[in-house]
Amino acid sequence: MTMTNRDDSEQLAWDFDAPESDGSSAAVVADEGLASLTPGSERWIAALQPTDADAMRLDKVDVASMSAEAAARLWARVAAWVESDQIAYYIDDAPVSSDAAYDARLRCLQSLEAQFPSLDSPQSPTHRVGGTFSNDFASVRHPSRMMSLDDVFSIEELREWYDGVLRGLDWPESKPLPMTCEVKIDGLALNLIYRNGVLEQGLTRGDGVTGEDITLNVRTISTIPQNLAGPEEDIPEFVEIRGEVFMRWDDFNKLNAENEDAGRAPFANPRNAAAGSLRQKDPRITATRRLSFYAHGIGSLRWGAGHAGNGHDVVNDQSEAYELYKKWGVPVSPHNREVTSFKEILDMIDYYGEHRGDIEHALDGIVVKVDDLGLQRSLGATSRAPRWAIAYKYPPEEVNTELLDITVQVGRTGRVTPVAVLKPVYVAGSTVSRTTLHNPFEVERKGVLIGDTVVVRKAGDVIPELVGPVLERRKGREGELRRFVMPTRCPSCGAELAPAKEGDKDIRCPNVESCPAQLTERIINLASRKAFDIEHLGDQSAIALTNPEEDRPDSIDTYAPNITEIVVKPGEEPEPYEPVAGLELPPMQTPVLSSEAGLFSLTSADLKDVRVWREAPIIEIHETVGSNGKIKKVRKRVGGSGLWHQVPAFWTAPTAARKRKEADIDETAEYPQYVVPDDAVVIREEIKVSRGGTSSVQPVYIRPAENTRKMLDEMDKARHADLWRVLVALSIRRLGPPTARTIASAFGTLDAIEHASVDELSQIDGIGSEIAESVVTWFTAAREPGNWRGAVLDAWKAAGVGVGQAQASGLPQTLAGKTVVVTGSLEGFSRDSAKEAIVLRGGKAAGSVSKKTDWVVVGENAGSKAAKAEELGIPMLNEDQFKQLLDTGTVE
C-alpha cells in the first residue's frame, strides 16, 4: 500500500468545477461491491445477491472459462431469481426487479445453457414464455402456441440477427427483404379468439401453451370489437388475433389522480396499472380503467368451407394481416412501418428513441419482423421465440435501486428540500445518484423508507424522479428500514425551520442573510447563464468563496495533511491511519464573501489563501496487457479513505520557476536567470548549484490559477449586464428570466423598479399578484436601515451594476401577444436560449401547456407537454419550424 503525498501537481478546487481531463494522467474509474472479485469465480458466485446492481454484473461473466461445477452453481442461483421475477411480473402484477435486471439474468441463463447443454431442459425459465398461470382465472389451452420474442440490447446484436435471417433464407444482401417495424408496447400480451366474427375468448399469454381466461374483463375494453366488421364473406370461421393491452399516458395520469383523491396508492407505471386492471375479479372495475388494445400478430386462421374461392382477402404477409384487421375494426398501432433495409430499421430505432415521450403509450423498444408469412414459416422458431422476429430494447427509462439516505438541501431562497441519496444507477443514458423529493409531504405521500428498494424514472425529461418503493422487497428487512424525519433546525446555520406562512408545504430557513448554504446557492444563481453568466464560477468555487470549511473533519483522527491518495494492490486493504504526534487542525478560515455585496470588489489577492477540504481517494492499481502487448498499469478508484486534506481553491500549488536560456537572461529582473510571471508571489527561495559549481537562487512561487483569472475577467464583464439579468441575480422569489425581462422592459431602470407598487407591477401582462408582491417585498426590505439587501444594491451600483437603461430588443416582434411552450432538447438552442429567443420577439415563453398556448415546440426527449398539446389540439413544431416561426411569426 502506498500513501501519495502532496507535490507540485496538487489538485485545485477548479478541478472539481471543470472535471475534463487532458488525457495526461491515468483515468480513475469508480467501482464497488463484487468488483474486487473475479466474475464467475466461486467467491463471486457465493457473494452474488438478488439485487438489480448485481444482476447487471452478470454480463461480465466469461462463461467459456467457467468449470461445469461453477456454471451449475451460478445457473441454479440465477434460475431461482428469474423464476421469482416471472411469478412477480406475470402473475402477481407486482414486479420486484427492473426490466433491465430481469433481462440480464435471462441472458446469463441463456449463455450458460449454450455453453453447458446439460443445464438446458424444458423446465428451464428460459423456455417459459411468461409466468405460469394463477388459480384466480380458468386455464385454457391456446389453439396455437403464443410465443414471446428474443431481445437484443445493441445495434451489433440486432445486425447479427438480421444477417442470420438473410443466411437462413439464403437471401442476397443486395435484394430488399420486406420487414415490419413496430414500437414495442409496454403492456400485457392478449390472445383474442373470434369464431364466425364473434369474440369468443380472451386469454393471457401465460406460459405460451396455456393462458388465463379473462374474457369478461376483455369485453369491457372499448377498443376491442365484440363482432368483426365487414361483409360476411370477409369474416373467417376462426381466427386468433394477438395483441397488447395497455394504458395510454393520459388515462394513466387520470387514474393516478383519481387514486390520490380517493386516498389510494398511485400505480408506479402504466404497465402495472394495465396488469392490475385487466386481471380484476370484478369486470366492473376493469371497465372503469380505460384500457386500450393494439393488434400486433396472428395465430390460427381458418376461413371455413362456406367461403367461395377468392371471396375473402388472402393473407400472405404481416402487413396484409394488419390491413385486414383495420377492415374488421380491430385497432392496429399507427406507428408501424414497412421497411426493406437495415438502414430503415435503424432510422425507425433512432426516430422513436428521440420521440419516446411523444406517443400515446409507454414503449421500451422496436420489434422487427420478416413480413412474408411463408418466409416466417421457413425460418421457424426456438422453444420460446420465433427466429423471424426480434425486439430491440432501448436503455431503460425506469430502474430499481437502493435509497441509501434522505438528506436535506437548503436553496437560495431558504427552501429546505429533502433529497434522495441513491445507490448510483444507470437510467436513460446517464448515471443517477441523487434526486429531489420536493418536500416532507411528498416523502410521506410516496411512502418511501430509507433503505428501501425504489423505482427511479427518467422519462421525457433530464430530471430523474423517485417514483416509489418496491414493497415486495421490504419483506424480511423491516428492521433495517427507517422513516425520514424532517429536521427542525437548518443543517447549515442552525436556525429554526418553519413554513413561510400557514398552509405552505415548503419548509424554510428564515436566516436569509447569514445562512452559508443560502448564500452559496445565491452565488451559484447569480453566476448562472440565466443571470450574470460568469464562466468559471461554478458550484465548488462558490462554496470556496462562501463556506470553505464545509467538509472540515471533526478531529485530527481523519486529518491527513500530506496524504492526497492511498494506492493499494487488488484485494489489499489500506493500513490504519495514525496522525503524527502534535498534529493539530488548521485554524478556521473566514469566508471571503459574507454577502453578494462583495462580489464585484474581489481581487486575486483576496483569494490567495483560500483552501478547501478534499477526501483522499483509495486507488487500486493492477497490471494488464495492452493491445500492443505491453504491460500497463490501470488505476481504479475503489472508494473514499475518510482522510481529509486541504487544497488551494483559487491559486496554484508552489511552482519552481523555469530557468531562462543563456540568451534570455534579464539582468534587470529580480531573478535574472528565472522566469517569474508578473502576477506571481514568491513564497521561498532555493539554492541551485550547476554542474560547473556555480550557484543561483531559484524562486518558488504561487500565482492565480488560469481559471481564477478568467473568473475575475468574467466578473468585470458582468458589471455591464442587462437590467433583467441583474433582477434575476438578486434571487427574488418567483422571479425568473422571462418575468424579469418583462419587468425590466416595462420600467426601464432599476430605480423605477425599486419604487414600483404591487398595482403597477400587476398591470403588466404576464405579471401575477404573487410575483408583484415578491418584487415589492424584496425592495421594501432593501430600503430598511441596515438590511443586507440594501447593502447588496448599494455595492453593486457603486461597481456600475444595474445603473444603465434597459435595452429594448432590436429584433422584429414576430411573436407579439403569442404564447409558446418549449419541451425537450433542441440542437440549436439551450432551454434558456429558446425561451430568450421567444421573449426577444415579443412572445411569452410559458412553462406549461394550456388552451391559451399558441404553439408547442417539441424537441428530443419531450415529455408530457407534447401529449397535452396533442390532447388540446395545439400545433406542435419541430426545430426548423420553430426557427421559421421566430423569423416570420407564421409556420407553413
UniProtKB/Swiss-Prot annotation:
Pfam families the UniProt entry points to: BRCT, DNA_ligase_aden, DNA_ligase_OB, DNA_ligase_ZBD, HHH_2
Binding site for Zn(2+): C490, C493, C509, C515
Reaction it catalyzes: NAD(+) + (deoxyribonucleotide)n-3'-hydroxyl + 5'-phospho-(deoxyribonucleotide)m = (deoxyribonucleotide)n+m + AMP + beta-nicotinamide D-nucleotide
Domain of life of the native organism: Bacteria
InterPro entries: BRCT_dom (IPR001357), BRCT_dom_sf (IPR036420), DisA/LigA_HHH (IPR041663), DNA_ligase (IPR001679), DNA_ligase_AS (IPR018239), DNA_ligase_CS (IPR033136), DNAligase_adenylation (IPR013839), DNAligase_N (IPR013840)
Database matches in PANTHER family: CHROMOSOME TRANSMISSION FIDELITY FACTOR 18 (PTHR23389), DNA LIGASE (PTHR23389:SF9)
Stretches the record annotates as Disordered: 1-23
GO molecular function, one term: metal ion binding
Protein name stated in the entry: DNA ligase
Gene3D superfamilies according to UniProt: 5' to 3' exonuclease, C-terminal subdomain (1.10.150.20), 6.20.10.30, BRCT domain (3.40.50.10190), DNA ligase/mRNA capping enzyme (3.30.470.30), Helix hairpin bin (1.10.287.610), Nucleic acid-binding proteins (2.40.50.140)
Cofactor list: Mg(2+); Mn(2+)
Residues reported in the UniProt entry to bind NAD(+): D99, A100, A101, Y102, D103, S148, L149, E182, R205, E244, K369, K393
Active site: K184 (n6-amp-lysine intermediate)
Keyword entries, A-Z: DNA damage, DNA repair, DNA replication, Ligase, Magnesium, Manganese, Metal-binding, NAD, Zinc
SMART domains, per database record: BRCT, LIGANc
Domain BRCT: 810-892
Gene designation: ligA
Any one GO CC term of the record: cytosol
UniProt family annotation: Belongs to the NAD-dependent DNA ligase family. LigA subfamily.
GO biological process: DNA repair; DNA replication
Enzyme Commission (EC) number: 6.5.1.2
